[in-house]
């Protein structure tokens, strides 16, 4: 299915690209989220007339994401207290939801879908550098400290 991208999407392309995607991916995910439109003649003409407006919107979103990244990078170490055993191994784990809640409590709103944990959930006491993906190409690093709860 031919679609026109209205936003930068990883592994597909950037604003204005016409790409071929599977019809289920387009119908069930991309179109409902407003990231693409079908590549009909009318939509191609509409896109060309609104191209500057859409590019300005994308630039504005990127600037807002970069401002949030600056605020997140300026945060002091975020501390999470969790029950742990004698050797520093946690009972349970710290996942994306826990990290997002802790950063939000520290003063900057973050949703769990923005938190990136490439090695999976955190299971030990210690200091970690967590990546927050605010936009398709804007990342922020946050220092996270996990301590044993008393």
UniProtKB/Swiss-Prot annotation:
GO terms for cellular component: ribonucleoprotein complex; ribosome. One of its GO terms (biological process) is translation. Disulfide bonds: none annotated. Keywords: Ribonucleoprotein, Ribosomal protein, RNA-binding, rRNA-binding. InterPro entries: Ribosomal_bL9, Ribosomal_bL9/RNase_H1_N, Ribosomal_bL9_bac/chp, Ribosomal_bL9_C, Ribosomal_bL9_C_sf, Ribosomal_bL9_N, Ribosomal_bL9_N_sf. GO terms for molecular function: rRNA binding; structural constituent of ribosome. Belongs to the bacterial ribosomal protein bL9 family. Binds to the 23S rRNA. HAMAP family: Ribosomal_bL9. This is Large ribosomal subunit protein bL9. It comes from Photobacterium profundum (strain SS9). The gene is rplI.
């Amino acid at each position: 299915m031919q679609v026109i991208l209205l936003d930068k999407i990883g592994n597909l392309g950037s604003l204005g690209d016409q790409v071929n995607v599977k019809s289920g991916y387009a119908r069930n995910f991309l179109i409902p989220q407003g990231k693409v439109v079908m590549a009909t003649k009318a939509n191609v003409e509409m896109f060309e007339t609104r191209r500057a407006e859409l590019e300005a919107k994308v630039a504005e979103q990127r600037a807002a994401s970069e401002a949030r990244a600056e605020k997140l990078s300026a945060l002091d170490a975020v501390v999470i207290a969790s029950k742990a055993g004698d050797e520093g191994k946690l009972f349970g784990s710290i996942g994306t939801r826990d990290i997002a809640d802790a950063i939000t409590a520290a003063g900057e709103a973050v949703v769990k879908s923005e938190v990136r944990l490439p090695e999976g959930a955190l299971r030990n006491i210690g200091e970690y550098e967590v990546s927050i993906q605010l936009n398709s190409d804007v990342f922020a690093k946050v220092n996270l400290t996990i301590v044993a709860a008393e």
